[in-house]
Design a protein with these regions (language model features):
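Nucleotide-sugar donor-binding catalytic core of glycosyltransferases
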Residues: 1-154, 158, 185-203
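Residues at or immediately preceding the N-termini of alpha-helices
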Residues: 94, 162-165
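Conserved donor-nucleotide binding/catalytic region of nucleotide-linked donor-dependent transferases
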Residues: 164-186
């Protein structure tokens, strides 16, 4: 993907075209924006149904300032699972990763390497968990990224300071699973509407 937005999409000229951008930046406001979604291997590693036993879990790489901030907050959270890794795909295997996620209620979703969007945000929802979305990217820029990406108010809690996670978790748990159901329903509706819009553009 073009996460750094180096491809000059504005140079594309055609009288009958729809352009979709994954990892959109602010300069892509006029284009169709496509969510990153889940990795292909999720469908082959779906966990068996289990009760939620962790309040919070995070397994992933600690590579930039937002994840470093989260790495200091996670050990302070009661009833949590925390598995830091040194790099992408260097931690739990996919089956174990999704098993741990599925038995958790809340998943912090720190910024991706360049933009805020990441596989984890969508994996979290597909695993019937409640995501906490980052409001700050890896370079320290503040942006309500998911509202920008989906061009609507996304029903997800966002955070500017991961050190406040310990305070935020009890607040989210007090409304769980209602808040989780809300984001899952929103995601199902988005996927349906995306299919409808793609078919409309193809048939136009």
């Amino acid at each position: 993907g073009d996460e750094s937005a180096t491809f000059k999409v504005d140079k594309i000229k055609h009288n009958n075209i729809e352009i979709w951008i994954q990892y959109p930046h602010r300069k892509h406001s006029q284009y169709n924006k496509l969510a990153l979604g889940v990795p292909q291997h999720l469908s082959n590693n779906l966990p068996q149904y289990q009760d939620k036993s962790y309040d919070v879990s995070f397994a992933g790489q600690i590579t930039h300032q937002r994840r470093q901030e989260l790495s200091k907050a996670m050990p302070t959270i009661a009833n949590s699972f925390y598995e830091p890794t040194e790099g992408f795909a260097q931690g739990l295997n996919p089956k174990s990763y999704y098993d741990k996620m599925f038995i958790s209620k809340i998943i912090p979703c720190p910024s991706g390497q360049v933009v805020i969007d990441s596989f984890r945000f969508y994996e979290t929802i597909e695993m019937l968990c409640l995501p906490i979305a980052d409001n700050i990217d890896s370079k320290g820029n503040t942006m309500n990224y998911y509202n920008f990406l989906f061009e609507e108010e996304v029903p997800v809690k966002t955070i500017d300071n991961w050190n406040l996670l310990q305070t935020l978790v009890p607040e989210l748990l007090s409304d769980y699973p209602n808040n989780m159901h809300q984001i899952v329903c929103w995601w199902i509706k988005y996927k349906r509407n995306l299919f409808i819009e793609l078919m409309r553009q193809i048939n136009a």
